[in-house]
Amino acid sequence: GAWATPIANLTLSSYYGKYADNWNTAYLGSFYKHPLSGQRALSFNLNLYRSTDTGKAKSGEIDTTTWSLMISYAAGAHKFGLGYQKVNGNNPFDYVNRGSIWLENAMQLSDFNGPREASWQLKYDVDLAGIATPGLSAGVAYTRGSGIDNSHLNAVYANYLGYSGVNGKHWERDLLVRYIVQHGAAKNLSLQLRYGVHRTNKAQGEANMNQLRLQAELPVSIL
């Protein structure tokens, strides 16, 4: 893959992946940030995936186009986002490793990647350094998906998932608190507390779930 910055505040990226005898995936992405006066900015993040079966097609016939767009407005410590995501195809948008996709509506408990699914998201993030302590931030996101049609899954996905319903819909709400250590031996250690709630109807196929997750990340410089 490759990325480029052809003009100020615009980043373009393109990648290609192959899962041998299953599918090929091409990715295009763009991010643009438009500065405004007074610590304000408007940004646009677009992601597009195109997946088709390849070789022995062990995952069956695959022909999906999936894209997402997030429009964000930042004002000082506050950031508001409105996102939309769409899957075009009879099968879910699939990938190899969880957490390895750049789609705006990929949440903590669901990726909102069902066949023919359309989803939208509202989110809010705040940097609490000015009113609490440096390194502390929080966020909340709500995503709702609908129009999921599992009635045209290929035989491989139908057997594996066991889904067959139409008019599937679901929603998820995620809360996040993050703290990044500012000084000392543990400097840059990131601690995240995440709480996700997912609710769905029977046709969507996934489970109703509440999940509390504590995550710690410490970057290490090798070179």
Predicted feature locations:
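Outer-membrane beta-barrel translocator/channel fold
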Residues: 39-115, 119, 202-207
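Transmembrane beta-strand segments that form the barrel wall of outer-membrane beta-barrel proteins
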Residues: 9-20, 31, 42-52, 138-142, ...
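C-terminal structural cap/anchor segments
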Residues: 77-178
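Structural signature of outer-membrane beta-barrel domains
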Residues: 19-21, 49-53, 85-91, 129, ...
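Repeated loop/turn-to-beta-strand initiation elements of outer-membrane beta-barrel proteins
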Residues: 8-13, 37-44, 77-82, 89-91, ...
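Residues that define the transmembrane beta-barrel architecture of outer-membrane proteins
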Residues: 22-26, 63-67, 116-120, 169-173, ...
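Outer-membrane beta-barrel "beta-signal"
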Residues: 122, 175, 179, 208-223
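Residue-level signature of outer-membrane beta-barrel architecture
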Residues: 3-6, 32-34, 72-75, 84-86, ...
